[in-house]
Amino acid sequence: MAHTIKSNLSEHIIKIDVYGCGGTGSHVLNGLARMAKALNDLGHPGIHITAYDPDVVSYDNVGRQAFYDADVGQNKSKVLIQRINLYYRQTWRAITKEAPSSSKADIAIACVDTISSRSKIAKAKYKSGAYIIDCGNAKASGQVILGQYQGELPFPYEENRDLVEGEEPDEPNCVDQYYRQDLFINSMIAGHALHFVWSLFRRTSLDVRGVFTNLERGITNPIKC
């Protein structure tokens, strides 16, 4: 059954939280900057982003994530938001902390890679009906799940308990990261997440609320509403 999108998403500046600014989150932020420009061109009031991440850029992040050599040593959320604000004339915010315990965002996008971080996001309080998008990946596969907090769509972490329960994944080092995780899986997952955000603004209803994708097998399966 199709999900009817809330009509007020086109009536005012939409607040979007991004939790995690690394592999997937850095690509999501850059895509949101392009989306903001497109929405303004179409007459939409626009979006305002608050990005959360306590981590700093390491040399290992350059290339896989949307960072450069000059960014090494700087906080991930700050360096990305500063760049976007400069190039796109935005006033977005960077918070050098983990996701908050409560949020007034209209849309929250989780781009974290640990069960503990997801658990905190799952326990947080959001606006009734706020859209929550979970992004995650393994070596060459991943998922993007769109849900709602106290809304018509299921809350992603109630429906998918494996995202917040179980053992933490091992952290790859700089030598084996390219063997343990496909170079383009993060940007692929980010692209799917951005498509859902764009659809919330540009469509009146959704038939699909998520995807499971596998690069090695060339398969993407939809999660239908």
Where does each model-flagged region fall?
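Glycine-rich phosphate/adenylate-binding loop
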Residues: 2-24, 28, 104, 115-118, ...
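Glycine-rich adenosine-cofactor-binding loop
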Residues: 12-42, 50-58
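N-terminal Rossmann-like NAD(P) cofactor-binding subdomain of oxidoreductases
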Residues: 32, 43-44, 52, 112, ...
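Phosphate-handling active-site elements
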Residues: 39-44, 204-206
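Glycine-rich phosphate-binding loop and adjoining beta1-alpha1-beta2 segment
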Residues: 45-88
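Conserved beta-strand segments of alpha/beta enzyme cores
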Residues: 48, 91-93, 131
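A structured beta-alpha segment of the ubiquitous adenosine-cofactor-binding alpha/beta core
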Residues: 72-105, 112-117
